[in-house]
Swiss-Prot record:
Catalysed reaction equations from the record: a 1,2-diacyl-sn-glycero-3-phosphocholine(in) = a 1,2-diacyl-sn-glycero-3-phosphocholine(out); a 1,2-diacyl-sn-glycero-3-phospho-L-serine(in) = a 1,2-diacyl-sn-glycero-3-phospho-L-serine(out); a 1,2-diacyl-sn-glycero-3-phosphoethanolamine(in) = a 1,2-diacyl-sn-glycero-3-phosphoethanolamine(out)
UniProt KW keywords: Autophagy, Endoplasmic reticulum, Lipid transport, Membrane, Phosphoprotein, Protein transport, Transport
UniProt organism field: Saccharomyces cerevisiae (strain YJM789) (Baker's yeast)
Membrane topology: Peripheral membrane protein
Protein name: Autophagy-related protein 2
Gene Ontology cellular-component annotations: endoplasmic reticulum membrane; phagophore; phagophore assembly site membrane
InterPro entries per record: ATG2
Function of the protein: Lipid transfer protein required for autophagosome completion and peroxisome degradation. Tethers the edge of the isolation membrane (IM) to the endoplasmic reticulum (ER) and mediates direct lipid transfer from ER to IM for IM expansion. ATG2 binds to the ER exit site (ERES), which is the membrane source for autophagosome formation, using basic residues in its N-terminal region (NR) and to the expanding edge of the IM through its C-terminal region. The latter binding is assisted by an ATG18-PtdIns3P interaction.
Amino acid sequence: MAFWLPQNIQKRLLLYVLQQISLFSNIDLSNLDVSIGSKSHFSFHDVNLSLDDLNIPNVQINEGIVDELVLKLTVSGGVEIDGSGLRFIMTPLYSSGSQELHSDFLVKSIQDLTNSMLQFSDPLTTYNRYKEDDISSSDSSSDLNSNIEASKPAANGSYTLQNMRNKALNVALAKLKIALKDVTIRFIVNDRDPSDNIVEVHLESIQLITTDANLRHINIENITISSIQKQAVPDSPVHPFNNDDLSQSVYLSKMEATSLYMSAMEEQSNEDPSEPQVTQEEQENDKCKESLMEINNLNIAFKGLSSVNDLRMSNIVIDIQDVHLAIHKIVEIKNSTLKNIIDIIVTHLDANESFSCQDSQSPSPDKQEPSALSSVDIKCIYLNLGQDITVILKSFKLEQKENNSLAFSLGSFYSNSSPLTISHKTKPLLTGEQTPQSIALNMGDELDIIISHDGIAHFFKIFQFVSKCMSFYQNKSKGMMPQIASDTKRTVQLTSKAVKLSLKFPYFLLCFQVSPFIYDSNRELYIELVDVFKKLPSRCTKILTMSSITISNLQSPLQLGSYDDTLKEALIYSSVHAIIKEVIFNEEYSGIVQLVEDISAFGKLFTDSKNSECTGKSKSKRGSFLQRSVRVLNSSRFVYKQSLSANFSLKIDSMKLKVSEIIGPQFGSVEALLSNNFFAITDDSQIVYFTKNLKVERKTPSLLEPQEIMSVVLNKAVNEPVLYVHRRANGKLKVIFNNIRIHYYARWLEILKKNIGPDNASSKDEPVAQKLSKKQPTSGFPWELKCLDCSLILHPFRLKSVMVIVLDNLTTGGSSFIPQAKLLSKANTLFLIDDYQNFKIQKDKNWPSLINFYAGQGFSAIGKIDTLNFLINKSDGALLLDCKIEQVGLSLCADSFQTFCQLCIDLKYPQTFPDEEKFRTQLKNPIDVFKDIDCDLFNSAFIRENNHQNDYDSVHLVDSFLDKTHEFNNGARSKLSSQGSYEMDSSSGTATGGILLPHESYLDSAQPKEEDTPPIASKEQERDVDIRGSIDIEKVVIKLFDGYDWKYTRKFIANTVEKLDKELSKAEASSSKSNVPQSEANIFDSIYISANKNNVTDLRRNLDGEIQGVQNSFSDVSKVNLRPSKHYKALIQLNKVHVNLKNYRVDEPDESNSDNSTDVLNRCVVSVYEFEIIDNVPTSTWNKFVTLLKHEPWPHSSPMFLLDLEFIRPIDFLQAVELVMQLNVAPLRLHVDQDTLEFLIRFLGFKDKRFELIDEYPDIVFIQKFSTNSIKLRLDYKPKKVDYAGLRSGQTSELMNFFTLDGSKIILKSVVLYGLNGFDELNNKLKAIWTPDITKKQLPGVLEGLAPVRSFMAIGSGVKTLVTVLMSEYRQEGHLGRSLKKGGNVFLKTTTGDFVKLGVKLTSGTQAILENTEELFGGVGSNGRVYDASKFGSADGADSDTAAVLDLDTLFEEDQLVGSKYSRIRDHEPTAVVIDMSSPGDHNEPTIVSLYADQPLDLPTGLKEAYSSLEKHMHIAYDAVWRAKGQMKDDKRGGPSAAAVYVARAAPVAIIRPLIGATEAVSKTLQGIANQVDKTHNEQINDKYKSNRTDS
């Protein structure tokens, strides 16, 4: 090569450089000589680059300044460019439509450099010509080559020129050396927001050299990328700031200041050369500068740029020493800055994609172009996650293989910081290979990671940052040019060894050990086993195991079956679905509590951020659950199923959970088995979980078999969820139990009591409400719990019996951390069984409902609770419990009643104490009992001295007593004068007043003294109430059935009867017939059996008749039917029952700290507004056994029954508890039938030893005080039999069975008793007080009720009243005018009513005598009152002994019984009989209603019913004669004898039946007269007698 060529190239290189400097852009260097010497260089200071000529694709350069530029010309002909202080300010361009591509920029730069060296003409002309050339096509090298060849006439010349240009380019690049220092590039991301960040890239040095074989090297040292927060420019009149158009103020002109920074620097430099303010500004900017990334040494070596036609680069080798990434600062970049950066990236990617798409559509060679990248080697990467967390990645290598695949590896990945520790042993840790079809990764060593709370917090911030970036990217990429999908999708495969992840908690490590797993993007992620260990300083336990985990990331959402919060079928569409075969969990309860507390701290990281991020986003989707529906074609109809979209879904085949030491070691462990589980997280952050099988058991060595706690009840055909959990987007948690039985064991209370810690014991006096609210937040998330078709099984403490509460639909809700909840249960059925071991589940049978299930398993349905509302609240430091029940119904037999009562008592812990803890029998200091006694009090001298005074004091004359008596008598008279009548007796209408009315309760009516009142809690004690409870029951109905529910009871009674039969048989065989003894037995303290050989069969028949209500003298009873009767025998009805409970806060000091005070523990007030006992015994004609005594002075708003109980601890440090009782009962009306009374005594006296509650320390309640009011009773008693054996044995109470009482007056006087040892002593004391009082003082009132003399006594009392009133009025007024009229009215009313009532009784008695006479002569007697189908339906009715008087057709025609329950004749009301079609008898036995029932209200009605009765009985007599006539005609024997027989049969009926009708008609007429005279009498009759009307 000629010597002049390097010098020309050197000159052209110099010219090219100078052309880029605006200061020398117009200088002509064509005749410039270059000298070779030591000072052959040019130096420039503060150089501004030509921004118009310097174009970089997708970037607008706003400023380019070089502080110092040195151009050196070397001896070898090269050019060295040394620069320092390079500062550039650029703005990325967001629009890619008119921007230049990077390839165009490179081609243009090379063309400029080559043309500047080959043109020997005017360089400016050459430069301008090449500048005007079209070199901006996409295929730059081929188009440029064609343009050059077309401009040359000869091919040889073109080839020569091309070689010269390539040669010149290679020489120029080989002789060119560039070394730049202190290069700063600032990118203004958002030019419209002055507060936005500026990204600064600083290069400490950069060097470009070319070595042998055209190998180019770019060496960059200390690259720093920082984020600068702009400082707001203060307002100034010289430099106004406009936010609306920042670009105009920043980039106004290239000759003036082109940035906020440079304009300030230049203006300040012109004013002051020393530039003190610039330094201050730079320092302030440095304070706001955050370093994001640092690269210590970056070396890039490549081949290429050797020809103008071939500008490709190949064999690119990148070598990086250290990379420092400040991740914790990157994640804090402002959202606006981050969004702008992503917008730029997405825009440029879209432009490059568009170019690549165009290029791919053009013809390309079959051979794929190899990648220009050869290898990348990064020695070390430092990831700074926080101030104390640094993750180090070493030896990251990437290498291009011959088969166009890319291999990469990571040597190590570790961290030794306290919040995060990562370690492994084998190197390299990760290797992989990328091909156009797949990416294969292989982790060659086990990875051990330990992370703390701070580490998770930093990782979560990174996760949020990445999610935010992806969200911005997805939003920006919408609407961009769609990418052309490749034919083959690249798959990702990962093979990993075991990974160990440990979470660091304050007291333990939670380690997750993941077995080697495989991931295939085309298939799924499969993990064989995941174990979770809990590492304590002393031990390590496995708490969780998950096996066979499969996670699938689906391209299209998978449709899964689910349920909504009403347990209706729904659909869930999920893109990520996981399946776990089995989950096993085992941990202690205390460890779970600690783990939950520690994990909750981690959970705050997620909840706080999610609440802030999803506030606006969830508004549109909130409530979207189950609002959409999908129509699914099912058979021949459409089924609409609600749908939901989920981010993640999980199916777990089996879950085994074991929690040990929940209460203490004695409790054992609780194990749960849940199968067929489903879990999903929806798009709007809702959580759905359900399981279709659930079983929870308690296991402990003390139990032979596992103790069931919770399980599925019925095997339904439709497999519905049994447990459903739904957390809504607003945070409300809803839990549903379906078809589940839950067990409660009272034995748990004993374990709980023994395991109460000292801390809880010391805080026993702390209010319950304060305990609930202690250390709890003021608000929480709402929750709701539902139980559908569930059952609650209650196991008592000592008994084997069990009560089941079937919950049809129970709903409860409240808010977490707040002691407030509401409960609503609509229908609850009660079941009872005597021994739970008799409960045998039939698993193979399908039951339609829970009620049928328990009824078929040996349980007895004893009642139902309708509409229960329960409320828990807190007020004034006390816990409020409010329960409201609409109705409670109980149906009980004697044995089930005892079981029910004893079970309710035994549901609590039987807390008893020995006598040493209840009493102090030995005193520490002796007491002198004679200390305060005056020994001279009874001396003769003292008595004589006070004798005179004592004589006067011995008798007190109370004058006011006589005055009060006089006032009382005057009051009685005034009452008579004002009302015109005396107060009538409720049953007989007799007067209760007179001139001198004995006030027997006068002394008892005095107000009790202050010391006699019960110790009612004071206001101060009311403030110390810990728990307030109230129970309001609108109605309680208790039905008492005869018979027995339990098989054990029935079998025992039957065996006892058989045993008596055998004993009598043996006694008869061993002795003579006359000496057979009487056998007796007492069963359950309720049934007394006495029989001999002759009446064993009668005994069975009587027992069967008493229980079932059927007396059949002709049937042979070989076995007693002891099952519950078909209908109840008695009904107890309570209305408006209210129970008020108060539990007071008391201290429990020991003896040393005691002040010997008395504590009121709790108080219970039970009130019943109205109660009645209904008599439904078949042999009884009476209606109400107990009811309110009408027309007695009793406040309408006061309850009929009030019981006030207070439990008092006399000495605070002793455990003895005493009871204070106060009883108030309203006046009562009693209608006592002997059969009903015996049934109630037998029912309530039943005692089964199996249900006796035996305590460790038997305790009898000590009644400190008992008080009751005066109770007025009005008694009707109907005896039916007399127990002569009991009378002979001395039971004087049997004498009552000789007399019938009607309206006897009894007053149980007010009693106050102290110091009673139990209720048995209370009963004896009350008998000892009330019985003598009645027999000595109230015999007139009792004898007044004797039935034979009652009417005569009432008439006599009326005559006495008339005479007495007349005499009194005559003495006062002197004449008898007005008083005679009033007294006569009273006498007439009283005597008329009593005369009529007496006539009614006489006619009714006459009717009974006539019916008995008819029956004696072969008639039906009293059975003729009703129709018996069994008698009229026999074919041989004429010859039968039980032949009916009327045939069926006739009775139907006459009485119109078809379609009606009661008999009616010609639209008349029924007479005096009724056919009870629901009779408990097996042979349609009728229930005979008393002739006194359903009396006519007045005389017209009485006459109407009298006519109906007479007509009816006349029809019966006529039918009997007509029937006899027909039988005589049908009799084949004929003859006078046969006719006489038929006439003899019909004669009694034909003669007596009209008499019966006449007596009944007279009775009805008299009843109408009596009720018309006394309007209140009919109300009393309705209370007393059963009615045959449907509306009764």
